UniProtKB/Swiss-Prot annotation:
Residues 17-253 form the tr-type G domain. It comes from Komagataella pastoris. NCBIfam families: small_GTP (TIGR00231). GTP binds at residues 26-33, 158-161, 213-215. This is Elongation factor 2. The keyword Cell inner membrane does not apply. Catalyzes the GTP-dependent ribosomal translocation step during translation elongation. During this step, the ribosome changes from the pre-translocational (PRE) to the post-translocational (POST) state as the newly formed A-site-bound peptidyl-tRNA and P-site-bound deacylated tRNA move to the P and E sites, respectively. Catalyzes the coordinated movement of the two tRNA molecules, the mRNA and conformational changes in the ribosome.
Length: 842
């Protein structure tokens, strides 16, 4: 137990080589918060008695009631290492004290945006995997997010006590199950190898995998056992570590190591991992759980475990917990793994700088980030807002990448749309206070140097969700975070009492600040819309809105799904529209964009800010575009980043460059609200075939061109066999075999399609993966539990957009009904207008 003072923390912060910023990530219910507890307890914040039950990082009331983590919370830990351990660290360090900033993040799919925010400010990740369930869909999603941010993973295989007590497996089975889990983690990592970081895969024999039980508070790495045996037998620890995993066997008769599983006489030998690592653990479990009073003291003496008087009287699980905690304390194994194998900010920022910084990679700011220099110009990235205890205000939560933040310092607050040299999205204000985040409390601190995580008071009014703080006007922003989920479910919110309206508006502002992935806006019909990533996410957001942010009773509409509008063919004829004054004409055709390219644009692989020649090259090589077309992309839409394109295919048009901005603006308007549902368009490419313009500049201004472009886009769109795309969830369901029938019947009823069904080796569980339209997903969990007597647990994550069958213009079809309902809800005319409305004859 360590008692911190802020001054001690501050002196540690200056030795940046000894700081570790890491997040804990995992699938829901694999035990992140419980594991985090055993770490926090070591740093002296909760007492030993409560660990495993306190879930210290679940700070909110609803988190404690539901037993899930919703927001990510930060905590600082302190750790000291022995001299011979410090020697093994492959990066520069000073002294033996380490400061670990740990962020516990949620595992539930709906909150993966919280995880993204946590990952941006950390350099390493502790990936927790349940040893019975293995690598699940969310483990993969989060791991991918981490690797995309160039974050180094280490793995903990948790809930080993379940395997021992519930499934009663043999040692070899357990070893095989560990090996399989490690392999499936490495498969995900291998698909994301990055040459700058080197090999990121995890290996038990190198000490980058720990095994343990968060609930019982014990864990071990192969390295710890190697240390024990190397002292006992006097062999080299590094050699011992390699022997304790994989196919190496020890023959006790000849005292020799072999890699064959039989000795000379053909008798089977026991694997070294089973013999030296698992055997003592299995023996302890067997002796204690079978109440063998005479064996226990002998074992404890051999393992050098000393119990206090009152602890000797315990039995069963209680005794097991105490003994295992003394034998293999979880914090030791995890802290050792974190300190030895995760990078310090100095190491990590050297290779993360170019993925973090938007500007040129050779300017002084990027160099400051790369060197993590506390004396360079200030660069702070704010990744999210954390509500303070008095509800009204927020702490800005983020990380100093270069320079030093001081209380009272004047900073430039740059929002995500800021461009150097312009005044948009920029405020210059003083930082009121800087604080350290410690789970449920905050500690004031004078200044924070580069490489550390902090909270800032007094700038919350100027930032929406995330942004960059700098002191120099030449500095570019840090890159915006890419969220792996998109808000696809929305509800309309009204107040029950009209006088409360201003409070609702204020509450919505606060809500969109506090959650990185919620959208709030006012629709055309004047409703207040809140959009979230799924049912649970929305439920939590609305609860927050009602209780904290607005504090007034609300009326909430049933949830509605957002759609996308697209085309399935090329326009059947060239669309033409004339401007209001009849002097300008635009000729267009629309055609669909391949799904591959749309995804690449949405994931940011093809980016509007890329160099156009480089982008043309990629589009020609990978997506089969014509190079001349690819070079003449005028813009992406909507919002300048969506998956719709304008391509200029016109030849020798006079004054064309003058109306380019107006055409782009018209296209942004058209793609933001399509003609069918008023939703965003997706995967629509518009080719400008010809433009006729008036000779006088005054007759071809924005007021003439913008509405014309919007109309002609609609006309071309409606001529190209329009279709509606709906969002699809990927559902992963874990269940025993007898529940599979129930799952299929519920999925069939909900238009779901099963894509795979497999049994997890060594367990009675099956994993069913299926696609389920978001529209049908409301109440899915409840129905599924009814059909399977509560044995099936679904996990849903947004996967892709899929075209709906049927003609959206025909009110009799299923799609037509959706269109009709949506148009009624938004107060439009009931029938979709024909193309004639937007098409002008010559």
């Amino acid at each position: 137990m360590v008692n911190f003072t802020v001054d001690q923390m501050r002196s540690l912060m200056d030795k940046v080589t000894n700081v570790r910023n890491m997040s804990v990530i995992a699938h829901v219910d694999h035990g992140k918060s419980t594991l985090t507890d055993s770490l926090v307890q070591r740093a002296g914040i909760i007492s030993a008695a409560k660990a495993g039950e306190a879930r210290f990082t679940d700070t909110r009331k609803d988190e404690q009631e539901r037993g899930i983590t919703i927001k990510s919370t930060a905590i600082s830990l302190y750790s000291e290492m022995g001299d011979d351990d410090v020697k093994e660290i492959k990066q520069k360090t000073e002294g033996n004290s380490f400061l670990i900033n740990l962020i516990d993040s949620p595992g539930h799919v709906d909150f993966s945006s919280e995880v993204t925010a946590a990952l941006r400010v950390t350099d390493g990740a502790l990936v927790v995997v349940d040893c019975v369930e293995g690598v699940c869909v969310q483990t993969e999603t989060v791991l991918r997010q981490a690797l995309g941010e160039r974050i180094k993973p280490v793995v903990v295989i948790n809930k080993v006590d379940r395997a021992l007590l519930e499934l009663q497996v043999t040692k070899e089975d357990l070893y095989q199950s560990f090996a399989r889990t490690v392999e499936s983690v490495n498969v995900v990592i291998a698909t994301y190898t990055d040459k700058t970081i080197g090999d990121n895969q995890v290996y038990p024999e190198q000490g980058t995998v720990a095994f343990g039980s968060g609930l019982h508070g014990w864990a071990f790495t192969v390295r710890q056992f190697a240390t024990r045996y190397s002292k006992k037998f006097g062999v080299d620890r590094i050699k011992m570590m390699e022997r304790l995993w994989g196919d190496s066997y020890f023959n006790p008769k000849t005292k020799k190591w072999t890699n064959k599983d039989k000795d000379a006489a053909g008798k089977p030998l026991e694997r070294a991992f089973n013999m030296f690592v698992l055997d003592p653990i299995f023996r302890l479990f067997a002796a204690i759980m079978n109440f063998k009073k005479d064996e226990i003291p002998v074992l404890l003496e051999k393992l050098e475990i000393n119990l206090k008087r009152e602890e000797k009287e315990l039995e069963g699980k209680a005794l097991l917990k105490v003994v295992m905690r003394k034998f293999l304390p979880a914090a030791d194994a995890l802290l050792e793994m974190i300190v030895l194998h995760l990078p310090s900010p100095v190491t990590a920022q050297a290779y993360r700088a170019e993925t973090l910084y938007e500007g040129p990679s050779d300017d002084q700011f990027c160099i400051g980030i790369r060197e993590c220099d506390p004396k360079a110009e200030l660069m702070v990235y704010i990744s999210k807002m954390v509500p303070t205890s008095d509800k009204g205000r927020f702490y800005a939560f983020g990380r100093v990448f270069s320079g030093t933040v001081k209380s009272g310092q004047k900073v430039r607050i740059q929002g995500p749309n800021y461009v150097p040299g312009k005044k948009e999205d920029l405020f210059i204000k003083a930082v009121q206070r800087t604080v350290l985040m410690m789970g449920r409390t905050v500690e004031p601190i004078d200044d924070v140097p580069a490489g550390n995580i902090l909270g800032i008071v007094g700038i919350d009014q100027f930032l929406l969700k995330s942004g960059t703080l700098t002191t120099n006007e030449a500095a570019h922003n840090m890159k915006v975070m890419k969220f792996s989920v998109s808000p696809v479910v929305q509800v309309a919110v009204e107040v029950k009492n009209a006088n409360d309206l201003p409070k609702l508006v204020e509450g919505l502002k606060r809500l969109s600040k506090s959650d990185p992935c919620v959208l709030t806006y006012i629709s055309e019909s004047g409703e207040h819309i809140v959009a979230g990533t799924g049912e649970l996410h929305l439920e939590i957001c609305l609860q927050d809105l009602q209780d904290d942010h607005a504090g007034v009773p609300l009326k909430i509409s049933p949830p509605v799904v957002t759609y996308r509008e697209t085309v399935t063919n090329e326009s059947s004829m060239t669309a033409l529209s004339k401007s209001q004054n009849k002097h300008n004409r635009i000729y267009l055709k629309a055609q669909p964009i391949d799904e591959e390219l749309s995804l690449a644009i949405e994931e940011g692989k093809v980016h509007p800010r890329d160099d156009f020649k480089a982008r043309a090259r990629i589009m020609a090589d990978e997506y089969g575009w014509d190079v001349t077309d690819a070079r003449k992309i005028w813009c992406f839409g909507p919002d300048g980043t969506g998956a719709n394109l304008v391509v200029d295919q016109s030849k020798a048009v006079q004054y064309l460059h003058e109306i380019k901005d107006s055409v782009v603006a018209g296209f942004q308007l058209a793609t933001k609200e399509g003609p069918i549902l008023g939703e965003n368009m997706r995967s629509v490419r518009v080719n400008i075939l010809d433009v006729t313009l008036h000779a006088d500049a005054i007759h071809r201004g924005g007021g003439q061109v913008i509405p014309t472009m919007k109309r002609v886009t609609y006309a071309a769109f409606l001529l190209a066999e329009p279709a509606i795309q709906e969002p699809i969830f990927l559902v992963e369901i874990q269940c025993p075999e007898n529940a599979i029938g129930g799952i299929y019947s519920v999925l069939n009823k909900k238009r779901g399609q099963v894509i795979s069904e497999e049994q997890r080796p060594g367990t009675p569980l099956f994993t069913v993966k299926a696609y389920l339209p978001v529209n049908e997903s409301f109440g899915f969990t409840g129905e599924l539990r009814q059909a399977t007597a509560g044995q099936a647990f679904p996990q849903m994550v947004f996967d892709h957009w899929a075209n709906m069958n049927g003609n959206p213009l025909d009110p009799a079809s299923k799609v037509g009904e959706i269109v009709l309902a949506a148009r009624k809800r938004q107060g439009m005319k009931e029938n979709v207008p024909g193309y004639e409305e937007y098409y002008d004859k010559l």
